[in-house]
């Protein structure tokens, strides 16, 4: 159990105190995978008993487990700096997370930012909960064949070899959600990833209760056509918020990492409607104050757009039966011109209209974004379009080796990362 506790905590991806222990269990497999859970699942009973019989190994294991538990209970920066903070939970929604090669549910920069944000939140003690999707194949792996052509490979992500655990109810059942799509329901399984102090919840449609075609909805990251992408974003946004509700979690803040998860603002408003008896317009106005949208895109073509007919097909019933509004009002939230029936539904527009704050990922990007979104704010001077900026960073313990950290600490001091970007120039 203690080995499992360590193997299933992604903190090992930036705190490498356990590396030598996994290497001792199976040096070849560890060097190939860097996946503690695979090593623990694959090691023979004889080998495991042999290393556990060594007093030095046992002492190191006990010390590592105790250190992990002490860290989880000790107040971190957030608790020390804001001991009376009313902020209980921030729900962070992202289409991808880059935490480790052992959990390949990412493509590139967006996942990099999301993964590092969770790791930094763990170190700082910020009360963040991540919400995402578990992909059976993830993003494709590139292979260049003998003719110089690219081949796309989709290796299968076996959940039994990933550092994740099924999310269970108090009665021990696997937590599953039912999402209604046109003409059928999709069952979603819920998983948990431990990222130090932070939890990441993942949903996937590969449930035996689903038809084969529907089991593959969460198969590929950024794969398939617009209809598949829409289904994934419905699962992420609407399914993700329902998952939090099923867990009894009521976040004060909903952070949308790009527009993929913008449907969460609709489900959050629907939940408020059910609790308060208010209509959709009031519910959206109230809940948007607690929603934050981070845009990463620098060109308008990068925003997800869906044909009006597709939105009507998949969200028409949801709008009328759950939100109490005609579908045209829902479509208007994702359009520049609400009266243009041919205009596609823009997820970034929905995210902006459903969020109380919007930010780009650098000062320059915020300036570009203000130009991109200026048409939504008629008669506003472009410099005053309400898009701020928070400069993207990285989680240094993940990317900085111990020798490099020692060198930079000697040259620039231990507090070199605590200033603003001007001090880093």
Question: Can you annotate each of these PLM segments?
Answer:
Residues 1-425:
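Catalytic cores of carbohydrate-active enzymes across secretory and cytosolic contexts
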